[in-house]
Amino acid sequence: MYKLVLVRHGESEWNKENLFTGWTDVKLSEKGVSEACEGGRILKEEGYSFDIAFSSMLVRANDTLNIILCELGQSYIDVEKSWRLNERHYGALQGLNKAETAEKYGEDKVLIWRRSYNVPPMPLDESDKRHPIHDSRYKNIPKSELPSTECLKDTVARVIPYWTDKIAKAILEGKRVIVAAHGNSLRALVKYLDNMSEEDILKLNIPTGIPLVYELDKNLKPVKHYYLGDEDKIKAAMESVANQGKKIDR
């Protein structure tokens, strides 16, 4: 039996402001730092330790991981970072307020942009400074692979090869693995692991900073999964994620 721990980064400054973030590199909020500390504390209390960690190229996930590893006294373990674990790219929506966008275009349309499996938002033009081709951290990645926008299907297409080539390989080698990433890159992985339908994945809300444990059999098929922490807090956190795209109350 293997165990895999997944953690969505703690609340970021743009999460706090309810903005579409995507590949924009935004730091953790004060609350996000606290969430990461709490996640690390819970993992320590439950006796978890790790041999290798995987994360994205974005600071909010990297800092969450660093805080957790510090709480565990394991800052020394190997960390592998990849753009394939980045958040879904939200195209021209990046930087816009989710609730105000819902007021302008309607909740149904924003829900489709946020959560549909195969409908991406409007793309960024390559001349836009927000496009990842202008970010030096991606200079070694072919321009053709860097997205202008993504739907969840696109995110799955880049996450799963990384799971197979890197993460699953490490687990099968007997390494204890933690992955600190993002709401949609983790949803892509959960969809694959649990063989979820396109419809069911739309309803999945992964809360920030709360460790999600998967117990896997010898073929890396899930036996069960569960969050660590207080059940009421977990439920409230999941509801908070679900409410992000709703219109502003007047």
Curated annotation (Swiss-Prot):
Pfam families (UniProt xref): His_Phos_1
Leader sequence residues: none
Pathway named in the protein's UniProt entry: Carbohydrate degradation; glycolysis; pyruvate from D-glyceraldehyde 3-phosphate: step 3/5
Species of the source: Borrelia duttonii (strain Ly)
Name of protein: 2,3-bisphosphoglycerate-dependent phosphoglycerate mutase
Catalysis performed (reactions): (2R)-2-phosphoglycerate = (2R)-3-phosphoglycerate
Keywords: Gluconeogenesis, Glycolysis, Isomerase
Site (Transition state stabilizer): H182
